[in-house]
């Protein structure tokens, strides 16, 4: 769960050294000191640090070790989600498609090709960023246009059906990876080191870079994130149902399961 946040535990380890902790015990005072809001720190950041330590405390207690388990986190104010308009989405993908890597190395050209596909996959299927980047080819059926998502948020599995044009895009993409870039990675979206998948940080940064190239970037009060593509998928689907006269109340349970929600 915390593979992308290993550094937080490393920071806690350094914090313990700085605090001259000598007893093998996760004490209440130590946890409280670690969980104190720091100058200039966002509530969400502090809460995230404490949440990771809570999981560590639960792990220690499962081994029979003494550990204080934090429960009261700082609650960050909920951000207003930026719902991407059709024009913004069109401009974003135009920026993605116009991208030409500054470095001529084959690996960079391959990554640009990956960005063009992964952002479309997230938008067209409403995937979470982790679900898209951690896809294996063995979980994608290019013949029938399906994707198996395993052990996603809430440890839930589900089957995703792709539209025909998206399936064809994935088929062409697989051929390009194999024939043009000679990339035989098990990952659908391999990183520069092909035994690894694209990182969250890389995908987030590229999204921001492409968004900055759109004509909407300067006038946007709240810059969108990759997750906004998932929200845009939901809004578009619901709008289509309303235009077609399909009762939302009847369809929302199906949409919820498609998205991998618990309820």
Q: For the regions a protein language model found, what residue spans apply to each?
A:
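Conserved catalytic core of the tyrosine transesterase superfamily
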Residues: 1-263
């Amino acid at each position: 769960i915390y593979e992308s946040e290993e550094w937080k535990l490393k920071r806690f380890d350094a914090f313990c050294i700085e605090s001259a902790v000598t007893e093998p015990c996760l004490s209440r005072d130590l946890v409280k000191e670690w969980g104190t809001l720091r100058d200039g720190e966002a509530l969400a950041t502090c809460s995230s640090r404490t949440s990771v330590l809570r999981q560590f405390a639960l792990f220690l207690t499962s081994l029979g070790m003494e550990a204080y388990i934090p429960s009261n986190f700082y609650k960050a104010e909920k951000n207003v989600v930026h719902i991407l308009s059709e024009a913004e989405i069109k401009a974003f993908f135009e920026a993605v498609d116009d991208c030409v890597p500054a470095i001529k190395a084959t690996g960079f050209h391959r990554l640009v090709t990956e960005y063009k596909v992964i952002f479309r996959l997230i938008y067209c299927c409403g995937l979470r960023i982790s679900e898209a980047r951690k896809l294996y080819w063995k979980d994608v059926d290019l013949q029938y246009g399906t994707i198996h998502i395993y052990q996603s948020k809430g440890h839930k599995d589900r089957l995703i059906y792709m539209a025909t044009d998206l399936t064809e895009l994935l088929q062409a993409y697989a051929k390009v990876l194999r024939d043009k870039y000679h990339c035989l990675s098990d990952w659908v979206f391999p990183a520069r080191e092909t035994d690894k998948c694209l990182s969250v940080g890389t995908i987030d940064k590229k999204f921001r870079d492409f968004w900055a190239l759109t004509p909407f970037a300067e006038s946007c009060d709240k810059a969108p994130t990759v997750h906004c593509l998932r929200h845009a998928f939901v809004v578009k689907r619901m709008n289509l149902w309303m235009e077609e006269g399909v009762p939302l109340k009847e369809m929302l349970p199906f949409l919820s399961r498609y998205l991998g929600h618990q309820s």
